């Protein structure tokens, strides 16, 4: 029976910051948040922190977001390695064009033992999960049979790598949307804020909404001041959403 793949979002990279030694400025933050503040102050050369309300890094970033000076958020970035996500979900994810992606290739990686992602709505119903698993098993069996026959068909191809690639790219047509994929996603703070605003909404597909919430939790650990305006709430159906009165970019 097909193995179920749980969603997992792992932080694998984040911005470091090296303050120029000739600039008379210091801050109470480091990494991406410090870079954001530095970039903002560089615009006005306000190194002496003349405004008490923006003297701290958190205060400065709050002001940046309040006034809509979002461009300085683009200097800092975060990368996640995401597993336990369905192919159908990544089709929605990759529409966010300000992110950079590196995704598992079904042409190079065999899917004979691929896992499946249980769609929201089925995860609390064992009977429906059995139906899903049976369908996944059937499609995987068909995939395996096609793969073997296609490799035999392309036996005259002298390159073993090309032969396998040709077989896999044809056989994958029968794999379900629920097939697990794995993907590295990199985005700057502004792009991540936009993603959260769009995809953590109650109007978004539930799987990508869950992804957005998980990303938000990790982003809030990396750069609390940048994502502090988002609040996570639980709906009547038990799913979560995240909203912010300051996330106004469409």
Swiss-Prot record:
Its EC number is 2.1.1.148. GO terms for molecular function: flavin adenine dinucleotide binding; NADPH binding; thymidylate synthase (FAD) activity; thymidylate synthase activity. DUMP binds at residues 92-95, 103-107, 172, 199. Residues 7-233 form the ThyX domain. FAD binds at residues 71, 95-97, 103, 188-190, 194. It holds the Pfam family Thy1. Binds 4 FAD per tetramer. Each FAD binding site is formed by three monomers. The active site is at residue 199. InterPro entries: Thymidylate_synthase_ThyX, Thymidylate_synthase_ThyX_sf. HAMAP family: ThyX. Homotetramer. This is Flavin-dependent thymidylate synthase. It comes from Mycolicibacterium paratuberculosis (strain ATCC BAA-968 / K-10) (Mycobacterium paratuberculosis). The lineage of its organism: Bacteria, Bacillati, Actinomycetota, Actinomycetes, Mycobacteriales.
